[in-house]
Amino acid sequence: MELKLLLLSLGFLFISCSSCMPGDNNGEENGSENGSNTDPGDSETEFEYEWDKFPVPVSAGTGMKWELQSQSDDFNYTADSNNKGNFEKKWTDYYHANWSGPAPTIWQRDHISVSDGCLRIETSRPDDVKIVKVTSGDKEKMMPGTYTGCVTSKTRVVYPVYVEAYAKIANSTMASDVWMLSPDDTQEIDIIEAYGSDRVVGDDGHKFYGPDRIHLSHHVFIRDPFQDYQPTDPGSWYKDVNGTIWRNDFHRVGVYWKDPFNLEYYVDGKMVRRVSGKNIIDPNDFTKGTGLSKEMDIIINMEDQSWRAISG
């Protein structure tokens, strides 16, 4: 997976997350942060940041403006997998806790690098790979681990904020992910969760969503005893009218976390999903009436998810 990241906050916070190509933008409603109204199609225009060429798709509202946040990163620098330099000013090359990922995933720090204007997450399975136990429901299987990467922001974000990634998902059965998670792992907002492979049926007959879908969702959890809520309506698996195969190019995918009970999702500058109110944000009252209210880390990773791996 390759990506860039943009973060804006209202009056505010805004993150731009992008990948290995020109990507995100930031600014006020009609232009860049300083209020200019540049033409994205004008090749003569010079931009301070790659995301300046795109208007922010969300109105800041009367008397408000979007402010670019320092966690935003267009990845226009080089960071070797074993010597990350500038990358470490904003990111940690691992998960936000001491966890190596959902088996058979094993996150490795040296599978993260930055080059050619993109954050790059690689995947490998060497001959001497560790064998791990994978469990999904009542199924259990021993299988080779999958080495890949995960990064976590050093700055947390909270509403009102617009976070946008300019990303190209991997051609893989693995998940390409951009998401936000509270430090206690009880509140989560998924910006991108997508599977780029054409393989949509497992060896056990389990059917998967394919490369024409992007999962736009959120979770609230109780950790003990474990309970997990997320919306299951068809709109959470976005498919556009053209049947776009999302792995074929870079796309901008963002979420406007307006407040604890309102989320808006944007794809290539167009709002494609809105979830609003307790009945869809937290119908089981796991948050005790507070909704999605906690500060969150931004996490970018790939995962060989247990349920999919065990299906074969």
Protein language model regions, located:
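Positively charged n-region of N-terminal signal peptides that target proteins for export
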Residues: 1-5
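Bacterial N-terminal signal peptides
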Residues: 8-16
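Bacterial lipoprotein signal-peptidase II cleavage site
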Residues: 17-28
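GH16 jelly-roll
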Residues: 37-312
